[in-house]
């Protein structure tokens, strides 16, 4: 894994300006202030107080989900502001129509909002105090397994002079009921791990062998590395290519992927360039929209938790092809934006390398709305973009395949930082000395992040069998 001035003309121009200023009357107080209207306007928005986002994925197992909501203003209001945050059942149809989804409505009578959703902001408050929000887990008779339920909250301002757009007035929670004995929960303030599994060498099920002394699993997010973006010249379309190992894992979804998910490990499809003119950061808007639909279709078909983008190994595109564009951070951001739009209840993550992860906005929407996690290259820290914080980024990255070592102190530095993730690439898991050495480093990671070491594995899962399948 791995960017004269022509002094005579200026003089003449300045002279012209000076001469005209001598003959024209000086006008005072005629400044057009309309250009500052947006600066003066007082705007509001409702957000999740913990992550600052308008859309949050919630996975329910055996415990209720607790978070908080708050109302934010673009500037100090200089007056008291009254706000009410409430459940908005009517927003379901609007949301589904905008995203092409078929989510169901989370039961309104189960939602618990502190103080009945009422907020009073002081004249010098830009952000309100937080209101606790409880999303209870429900029984299987009320809650279908793996069905996404929309919990839409709406902010209504009772005070004149505060404008709230339709989009900024809503904060949604995409709630899933996940059956199984999930045990990857982190305590408040604890960081999460983000692993890339080189599936050509390592069976993903080995993540179940890395269990901490307190009974929790070490791996939070697992990227199946990797499927590829490719171009079919005969059909004239961009598609997802899966090599024999990735094909086998997808075909044996219930035996390989779902056991991980049922224990709380989020499984993501890795996407990588593959030595042709298609590339993750060189698709046109049309090309990005089409490819995003293919990504979403695959994630839904195989019940994956999302996708990770890695912009490497692509050739220069044919700019006469309407599916392609010049490689750029703008094109990379467009693909992530379209992918999140196509599957809002899935995770969209990026390896901040090449042209992926370098734009703050797409169509005026900040990156935090369409990037869930950004992990950095080795020796670097993730860079939060608009709408993101360090908590959405990795604070350290280690490549195990090249004998990358992890010290307890390194992991502890991340644990004590503002960053939210520790990234590990290509860990081995086999009955050999190299894997045993790596296991010691992973145990150091566990101790540094969580204060306890890993339990020695009793066996390892062998590498998966190859299987050739058709491109998706």
Residue spans of the language-model regions?
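Bacterial N-terminal signal peptides that target proteins for export
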Residues: 1-9
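Hydrophobic alpha-helical transmembrane signal-anchor segments
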Residues: 9-15
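C-terminal motif of bacterial Sec signal peptides marking the signal peptidase cleavage site
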Residues: 17-21
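Secreted glycan hydrolases and related glycan-binding modules that recognize and/or cleave
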Residues: 23-82, 88-110, 120-472
């Amino acid at each position: 894994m791995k960017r004269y001035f022509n002094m005579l003309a200026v003089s003449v121009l300045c002279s012209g300006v000076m001469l005209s200023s001598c003959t024209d009357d000086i006008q005072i107080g005629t400044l057009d202030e309309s250009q500052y209207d947006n600066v003066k306007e007082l705007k509001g928005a409702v957000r999740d107080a913990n992550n600052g986002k308008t859309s949050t994925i919630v996975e329910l197992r055996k415990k209720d989900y607790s978070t908080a909501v708050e109302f934010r203003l673009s500037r100090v209001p200089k007056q008291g502001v009254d706000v009410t945050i409430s459940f908005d059942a009517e927003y379901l149809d609007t949301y589904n129509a905008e995203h092409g989804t078929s989510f169901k409505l989370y039961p309104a009578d189960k939602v618990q909002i502190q103080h009945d959703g009422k907020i009073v902001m002081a004249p010098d408050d830009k952000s309100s105090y937080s209101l606790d929000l409880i999303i209870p887990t429900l029984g299987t008779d009320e809650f279908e397994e793996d069905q996404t339920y929309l919990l839409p909250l709406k902010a209504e301002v009772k005070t004149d002079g505060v404008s709230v757009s339709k989009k900024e007035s809503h904060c949604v929670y995409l709630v899933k009921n996940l059956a199984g004995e999930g045990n990857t929960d982190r305590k408040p303030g604890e960081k999460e791990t983000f692993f890339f599994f080189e599936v050509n060498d390592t069976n993903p099920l080995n993540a179940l062998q890395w269990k901490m002394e307190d009974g929790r699993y070490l791996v939070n997010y697992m990227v199946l590395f990797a499927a590829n973006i490719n171009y079919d010249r005969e059909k004239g379309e961009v598609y997802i290519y899966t090599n024999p190992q990735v094909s086998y894992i997808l075909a044996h979804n219930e035996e390989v992927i779902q056991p991980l998910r049922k224990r709380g490990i989020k499984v993501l499809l890795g996407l990588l360039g593959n030595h042709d003119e298609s590339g993750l950061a060189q698709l046109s808007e049309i090309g990005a929209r089409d490819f995003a639909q293919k990504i979403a279709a695959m994630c839904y078909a195989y019940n994956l938790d999302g996708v990770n983008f890695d912009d490497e190994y692509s050739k220069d595109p044919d700019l006469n092809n309407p599916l392609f564009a010049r490689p750029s951070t703008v094109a990379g951001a467009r693909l992530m934006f379209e992918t999140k739009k196509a599957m809002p209840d899935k995770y969209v993550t990026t390896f901040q390398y090449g042209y992926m992860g370098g734009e703050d906005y797409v169509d005026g929407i900040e990156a935090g709305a369409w990037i869930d996690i950004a992990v950095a290259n080795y020796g670097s820290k993730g860079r939060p973009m608009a709408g993101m914080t360090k908590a959405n980024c990795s604070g350290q990255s280690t490549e195990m395949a090249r004998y990358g070592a992890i010290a307890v102190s390194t992991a502890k530095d991340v644990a004590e930082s503002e960053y939210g993730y520790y990234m590990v690439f290509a860990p081995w898991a086999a009955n050999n000395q190299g894997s045993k050495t790596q296991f010691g480093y992973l145990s150091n990671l566990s101790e540094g992040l969580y204060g306890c070491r890993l339990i020695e594995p009793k066996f390892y899962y062998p590498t998966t069998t190859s299987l050739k399948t058709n491109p998706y």
